[in-house]
Amino acid sequence: MQGAVYTPEMPPRLLTTAVLVFLCASSPSFAQSTANPGPPTVADAQAFIDRANADLLELSTAASHAEWVAETDITDDTEATTAVLNEQATSRTLALTAESHRFDNLAMPADLKRQIMLLQVTAPAAPKDPKLLAEQSELAAQLTGMYGKGKFCPGTPSGQDPAPGADCLGIDAISTIMSRSRDPEELTRLWVGWHSIGAPMREKYARFIELQNIGARELGYHDTGELWRAGYDMTPAQFSAEMEHAWQQLEPLYRELHTYVRARLIAKYGKAADRPDGMIPAQLLGNMWAQEWGNIYDIVAPTDPQLSQFKPLDLEAALKHQIAEKDPAAAPAFTPGTDLTSDKGHAASLAAGRAMVHYGENFFKSLGFAPLPATFWQRSQFVHPRDREVVCHASAWDVDSVEDLRVKMCIEVNADYFTTVHHELGHDFYFRAYDNKPFLFRNGANDGFHEAIGDSIALSITPAYLNTLGLADSEPPAAADVPLQLRTALDKVAFLPFALALDKWRWQVFSGEIKPADYNKAWWQLREKYQGVAPPVDRTEADFDPGAKNHVPTNVPYARYFLARLYQFQFYKAMCDASGYKGPLNRCSFYNSKAAGEKLNQMLQAGQSQPWQQTLKQMTGTDHLDAQPMLDYFAPLYAWLKQQNAAAAQQ
């Protein structure tokens, strides 16, 4: 649907509660009851849905504008405004959902029935009581703001406000340092410093969960987790089982990767990495949440001379060189010592950010998609503004369901953002493909689809593709596949257990299986069980480490990212097949294939108008989540990891 969609490591929302629902806050037609004393008819149901779609579309535009302002100018005032709008919006959506149940037992065309069902399962988990609803809306705004304004001030004692002018670091700056530092003590300080932002959220979050569950029960669900899992054209229990089955398929590959990486970290750091319980210290993996490990490739790269001769392309250097060469105005952004807050420095950063986005747009254009509208370039946020606080987590926006597509990012020129740009544009091209559908069908087939589109494109960022762009001098031989695959797996495979653990923790919090008194203990039990990672220092219930991950305080479901990591390989294989590619899956790029683009566009245009199983089958030939394409992709690496680990075990 309309609104914002966020990327994994910088986050999500397919139509958040705030956006879905401000929708109805002041709609004239919804202000009037459609109650009818007689039995409902199909004509009544159609009239209801027609009104709902029209009003939701009109009001969604206003909501999207409000949400955009709140996230691109974080102040107490924008927080307060968002809280009020959320409260009004949620109240009206709950009323609309309640009205829709009038048609529950009515026989009607499948298309109409599906729209009513989607309205019901996307209802926000919010209490009907106005006072409780107001409290929930205020808490939601506070938690989002606490994360968005989070800082680590190295010279400030824990629990104290920083002095004026103190040198404080936001999550982007911290993440950059963590990606590059190889000092275990520095990494521990940064990890502990950022995770300290969670503790003040703890009580607010516990109350927020209580209020959400009240709303979920009023909608007929046991808890909010069950409500979240109900939106997948299967029962909540079936959805949980589908995810668990996929993890069981993938776990052997992950365990081999974990074993290999742990051994290399011990070789690098010694006792700092060698825990007797076999866990990897989370701060050593190059990412604040240990969710993606690609930043430590230099530590774990193959040492076999036959493989070590193949060095991963320094894409960051290649991008900076090419961008500066094509647009000299961007060059100062890459010059050491440039003040990026100056007019010249900021203009250079903006030019570099726009150039990064053009790479992604050009890939979609090569598949036959139309260029992005002029307003996209005028209204998007590509870099961090100089004059205000913003939420830097990358997100894609469909503000008016016509042509007002945007992204909100704080782009840096590096390999990670190169991939993130492709990911976010996948959302925007998806938005545009289904914008001719009724409002309630304007969504991905499920939320995992939305996250997977751009990433399936990014899998085509192969050495051959980079060579085509002039970012690589030549295409490496097949012997180079293992190093390249290892670099990819450090992100894509390592991410899966983190995504699973995060939402399993949250589902158990919603269900009451995890009590507030055990929030942090349970968090680390799940992280250890699925990821095999542990915190760098002892943690207690005075801490709230889940709050240091954006998706928890902003209440964004995370299962979509687990799904997306698998769907992207299913989509990728389907488009490779459509392009006529023959050869190892991991070496395919369907850049410039109009046949692949047509297959992709057909899937995007369906939106949520049919069960995702049907859309998936039309795209891939199978109607279920399938890890096999991912396993096929990483087959060379899996064989090599098993060989390496077996040899190490014999030493």
What are these language model-derived features?
Residues 4-16:
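Bacterial N-terminal signal peptides that target proteins for export
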Residues 32-207, 225, 549, 553-559, ...:
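N-terminal helix-rich structural modules
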Residues 37-44, 78, 117, 223, ...:
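C-terminal, non-catalytic "cap/extension" segments appended to globular domains
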Residues 70-88, 104-125, 155-182, 217-238, ...:
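Charge-rich, acidic-biased intrinsically disordered regions
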Residues 166-172, 207-408, 477-478, 482-488, ...:
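Active-site-proximal, well-structured secondary-structure segments within enzyme catalytic domains
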Residues 431-456:
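Post-HEXXH active-site segment of zinc metalloproteases
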